Regions:
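Two-component system phosphorelay core
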Residues: 1-125
Length: 125
């Protein structure tokens, strides 16, 4: 087993393609870990902000927030969550009901945050 394989194995997080994501970070695992920790710290709040924007009738803001979360999750290798954020963004853009996608997004963000925190350990705010 080479060093790269060991690193990827140590970062095995359910629902995240860590090998793909670390490659996006040019192999810089430290930088990748930093952004994973940022997601744990800010991902749930981002989902809450999307809900608040929808509840307040500011659909354009909700679209922008969903788009930003979609980009972040794609960069981090969270393929399922990326797909959910993309579907939510599309529903919002089309003026379609988004409740089911929003609920799925919120629960998946929480699941991902918990899974990441269990692998990374305590996250400093």
């Amino acid at each position: 087993m080479n060093a790269e394989t060991q690193t990827t194995a140590q970062l095995a997080i359910p629902g995240i393609n860590t090998a793909q994501a670390i490659a996006r970070f040019s192999g810089d695992e430290g930088r990748y870990r930093y952004w994973l920790a940022e997601f744990v710290s800010h991902g749930p709040a981002a989902a809450t902000q999307i809900r608040l924007a929808i509840d307040n009738g500011t659909r354009d803001t909700a679209v922008k927030l969903a788009h930003a979360l979609k980009g972040r999750t794609g960069m981090l290798g969270m393929n399922e969550l990326h797909s959910i954020a993309q579907s939510l963004e599309q529903c919002l853009k089309n003026g379609e009901p988004s409740t089911l996608w929003l609920e799925e997004l919120e629960s998946t963000v929480q699941e991902m945050s918990t899974a990441i925190a269990s692998v990374l350990g305590p996250i400093k705010a």
